[in-house]
């Protein structure tokens, strides 16, 4: 049996741009992509912490170190610059690998600079805005 599991996520990134007239996708700073092991053209799920919207799109590599998080095309209607989003990637694994795999959790600051990369995730205390 194969399971779809969390591979990685970029946690609470700040949307820097939205471009309705572009063909689609999310542009992500190359440095963030590497830290989260996300490839160009990979499908990701985006969760908007400000309005609850959840949607899927694919990734375009943005300039390294720029902090860019830009939603393009129709997805631009679901975010505003300044919104906080979680960008999630998944992987299909067999049950054995799924039991031991530890996803990368990329924590960023308000300018989308990497603060910490964690391996795995745990439930945080009520009211916490980051995971322990």
Curated annotation (Swiss-Prot):
Q: Which residues form the active site?
A: 25 (schiff-base intermediate with substrate), 58 (proton donor)
Q: What is its EC number?
A: 4.1.1.11
Organism expressing this protein natively: Pelotomaculum thermopropionicum (strain DSM 13744 / JCM 10971 / SI)
Give the enzyme's main class according to its UniProt record, as a single word. Answer: lyase
- Protein name per Swiss-Prot or TrEMBL: Aspartate 1-decarboxylase
Instruction: Quote a single Gene Ontology cellular component term.
Output: cytosol
Q: Which UniProt keywords apply?
A: Autocatalytic cleavage, Cytoplasm, Decarboxylase, Lyase, Pantothenate biosynthesis, Pyruvate, Schiff base, Zymogen
Tell me how this protein assembles. Answer: Heterooctamer of four alpha and four beta subunits.
Q: Which gene encodes it?
A: panD
Q: What is its main location?
A: cytoplasm
On modification after translation, the UniProt record reads: Is synthesized initially as an inactive proenzyme, which is activated by self-cleavage at a specific serine bond to produce a beta-subunit with a hydroxyl group at its C-terminus and an alpha-subunit with a pyruvoyl group at its N-terminus.
* Cofactors named for this entry: pyruvate
Instruction: Show the GO MF annotations.
Output: aspartate 1-decarboxylase activity
């Amino acid at each position: 049996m194969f399971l779809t599991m969390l591979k990685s996520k970029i946690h609470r990134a700040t949307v820097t741009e939205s471009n309705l007239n572009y063909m689609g996708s999310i542009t992500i700073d190359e440095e963030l992509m590497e830290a989260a092991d996300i490839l160009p053209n990979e499908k990701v799920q985006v969760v908007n912490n400000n309005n609850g919207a959840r949607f899927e799109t694919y990734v375009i590599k943005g300039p390294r170190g720029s902090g860019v998080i830009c939603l393009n095309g129709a997805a631009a209607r679901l975010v505003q610059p300044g919104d906080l989003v979680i960008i999630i990637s998944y992987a299909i694994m067999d049950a054995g690998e799924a039991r031991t795999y530890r996803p990368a959790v990329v924590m960023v600051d308000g300018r989308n600079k990497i603060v910490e990369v964690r391996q795995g995730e745990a439930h945080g205390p009520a009211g916490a805005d980051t995971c322990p």
